Amino acid sequence: MRIGEISRKTYETDIEVKIDLDGRGKYNIDTGIGFFNHMLCMIAKHGIMDMDVYAKGDLDVDFHHTVEDVGICIGKSIKKALGNKKSIKRYGTFFIPMDESLSMCSVDLSGRPFLVFQGELKNSKVGEMDTELIEEFFRALAFNAEMTLHIKVFYGKNTHHIIESVFKSFAHALREAVSIDEKIEGTMSTKGMI
């Protein structure tokens, strides 16, 4: 079973994350941030992985520490669940429309952390959450999962729709990248490891 479990406690946050890459899309999410919870549910459901995320953070300061630290923990959990990466497809790219918006996400589980995030988020907030934290979340996740992650928003008007299309495209791209292909002997690299 490909399961990653991480607990992380700092002066700013207390977080527990468990991810089962071979799950059924079940989730229990509670970060104290409604819109963020909603987006994390998209990763589990559309990535068809089981995910538990419990976070208590200094939300009285702002949401930055909680969002970034959840990204750190999800990234570390993905890395742990992948183990030696034997027979994974490694790459995944997916486009998702959400009404008037269109986003693309491309994942390489390369062991080389990198993020490219292109696109305009029209409003500075959705609900009570600052939309600039979306990029911070994906940066923390990508660097701690040691993945190369490209996200591009092509267009959209409604900021909720844009962000939802980003999270769904990430979920589908990740699902493809972590998928097992028995024809792949060892790892998908001429180096012999990733």
UniProtKB/Swiss-Prot annotation:
Record carries keyword Cytoplasm: yes
BP-aspect Gene Ontology terms: L-histidine biosynthetic process
Keywords from the UniProt entry: Amino-acid biosynthesis, Cytoplasm, Histidine biosynthesis, Lyase
EC number of this enzyme: 4.2.1.19
Pathway named in the protein's UniProt entry: Amino-acid biosynthesis; L-histidine biosynthesis; L-histidine from 5-phospho-alpha-D-ribose 1-diphosphate: step 6/9
Cross-referenced SUPFAM superfamilies: Ribosomal protein S5 domain 2-like
Subcellular location(s) per record: Cytoplasm
Class of enzymatic activity (EC top level): lyase
A GO cellular component entry from the record: cytoplasm
Reactions that this protein is recorded to catalyse: D-erythro-1-(imidazol-4-yl)glycerol 3-phosphate = 3-(imidazol-4-yl)-2-oxopropyl phosphate + H2O
Pfam families recorded: IGPD
GO MF annotation terms: imidazoleglycerol-phosphate dehydratase activity
UniProt family annotation: Belongs to the imidazoleglycerol-phosphate dehydratase family.
Entries under PANTHER family matching the protein: IMIDAZOLEGLYCEROL-PHOSPHATE DEHYDRATASE, IMIDAZOLEGLYCEROL-PHOSPHATE DEHYDRATASE HIS7
Protein name per its UniProtKB record: Imidazoleglycerol-phosphate dehydratase
Natural source organism: Clostridium kluyveri (strain ATCC 8527 / DSM 555 / NBRC 12016 / NCIMB 10680 / K1)
